[in-house]
């Protein structure tokens, strides 16, 4: 934390509207909302900023079938709406806005919202989630919204009886491929390695599906089309003596190659792993900064489930309450 950085914050402090809160939650997936429910019930008057995607990744999921208590399953958006209402019922102040800068050098912790408002928080719960990764091809930007997607359940409907490609070799890629195969005429699964990393059950589903063709040891290196995606440039066994380049006609190109945690603004202060997941004390949501907790996918490289995110949101709120109590702040 250079003095230049703190000078910027001093200047921002003078210019910005500042609000003091006991408990600030950034992010509104299952982790953020569950933290808000528990913090609200503990009379911490929590303030939650919803972030770029209110409701989080689950709002892009049609059916959640593995969340306990819903034997028939529930839609992702419906589940998040229920959590939101529950948080509101217990007094959480839920707002739209994105955390754009952070200064966790000392308490109260300063979080800038939308580059225009400063929140000074005695405790901070980081529940900012993770965002889908892209390959980094220029064409991904060019065809964004015109055939390129990172969410099969959001956009699969547009590809009924069409041909699509899914990139990736893990569970997500296999799940997306199977989901799309229920809509599309044909699905290519483009896998860089000579094998799938997915769970056995997902591998079997993919390999047995008559609409899915798996292209092992293939790289997607570009897309083409006049008014949207019409095909993909592929390289088989890239860099090998028998490397082969060819094109396949497709209408849609779906990315399923993992996620990047939304932790960048906190990195100067909390520890992160090589991918960017926030490192917490084992078995707790505690970061190395006292009073700052991380919950949900932003701190979870292993499970990334709605129920585990909710569980860590609960833990973070309980930790925040204990921290404030020990400091005599409640």
Predicted regions mapped to residue ranges:
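Glycine/small-residue-rich loop that forms an oxyanion/phosphate-binding "nest" at active or ligand-binding sites
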Residues: 94-157
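FAD-site-proximal beta/loop scaffold in flavoenzymes
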Residues: 131, 136, 141-158, 257-303, ...
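A conserved FAD-binding loop/helix module that cradles the flavin
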Residues: 176, 298-330
